[in-house]
Amino acid sequence: MSSNVEEFRQILSSSEKIIVLSGAGLSVASGIPTFRGSGGLWRKYDSASLATPSAFAENQARVWQFFHYRREQVLNVAPNAAHYILAPLTIPRIRQSISPNSKFTHITQNVDGLCTRALEETMKDYHETDVPYPIEMHGRLFDVVCTAHDCDFRETNYNSPICPALKGTELVFGAGGPEPMVRRSDLPRCPKCGQLCRPGVVWFGERPHRIYEIMRLADEADLCIIVGTSAVVQPASKIGGRVKARGGKVALFNVELGNHADEADFVFLGPCEQSLTEVLGI
């Protein structure tokens, strides 16, 4: 395990297939708390217990209030330096200066969309139009999906609030007040069939988007850069190990070592926006 910047840059420059796996730590500097820990708690319910199909089946209003709160958080923040350091790596002519002839894929567990926003802004700055977007394996916070099995409605919705009944419930949370009562009939409905909608994120117990493609990329990669994740949630937690098992290198950028630090060839501890800037220097 090394923290030698020049050694890592040499590995980066010679790599041919690079993947980045990013997690909640990437967005901390934007003001979004991590999914776990004291910043990830919601009243007496922690976020993991609310982000499940069973939680939604039991209390749709509570789950929608939680995700409305998260939506309102993200609507008021912007990408940070860590997002803007990773974004240019997606653009081939920029990446060539630090890793010639390489292919690059950004896989994110985040649902806040900040990776994509940073990339779109970077594309405009460099006048690029045909660049692969990050793979958002856990979906997107601003997507809304119909719960009816025979309805294919899905849309991206940035309305604030997403429905009148949820307006102000995020303020009650912030003040530590009692849980507001919201009727199920007043929650977001499908405009096509009228049935209840759900947030368009992947909940615990559901299959991540494009997971087979992600595992294929991990099997082919010769460098995996893990940024801002404790590597707890499966199957994302397996990605670094798969790269390592096939002879690839793993670099970890995080504020702590995490569960799979023993798989890392390089470890750069500290806030992502600082360590990525210092090491990559883009």
What do these predicted ranges mean?
Residues M1-I282:
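Conserved catalytic core of sirtuin-type NAD+-dependent deacylases
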